[in-house]
Amino acid sequence: NIALDLFGQANGLLEYASKIDKKKSPDDFAFKRNEGDFYNLKISEQPNGHFGTTMLKLFFSSAYRYLLYEELSNSNDETISALSLKSIKEVKYHLKHSKSWIIRLGDGTKESNNKIQQSLNSLWEFTGEYFEEDSIDLEMKKNGIGLSKSLENKWKDIVIDTLNKAKIEVPKSTYMQTGSKQGLHTEYLGKILTEMQSIPRKY
């Protein structure tokens, strides 16, 4: 159900992008772009691994998307505002679901705690990209279309509170990945796109 919700949210945005572009269809954006033309955050292309890693990825992203859609519901762009309002209820459930599992795994057995801690250690360096701004973000902010303020502090409040309840520790390293908004990715995106785009590109 969560995957279907995310497909629906993505489809709404791709349909709007197609309407603005007037040349490319939603399928063109999804299946006919090359790796360097994708600007997704690197955390989304990391392998899901075990259940704890999957839930942690969902938790980080859901916390961000919930705050993002809440803010974008006030966008001057009526379509973005409407899509955001429609998505908030879904993402609120995703956040609640993933948060409960993070706490359950962290505050469970020694093995489950160790596994979720290892997942956190691996994924934490990808979380800084949520809050990077490029020239497009600044232009949208200026025109009242995009975010009017950073969501970083609110996101950290949600995340740190949950990690404390789960009895797992934020890594001490301050290194953060960057570059996805310039089309730079890890080796995993190419593999995902090869599988996802093979049939549409062939036919």
For each predicted feature, which ranges?
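Amphipathic, non-membrane alpha-helical segments in soluble helical-bundle scaffolds
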Residues: A3, N48-F59, S81, N113, ...
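Acidic, low-complexity proline/glycine-rich segments
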Residues: K24-F38, I160-K165
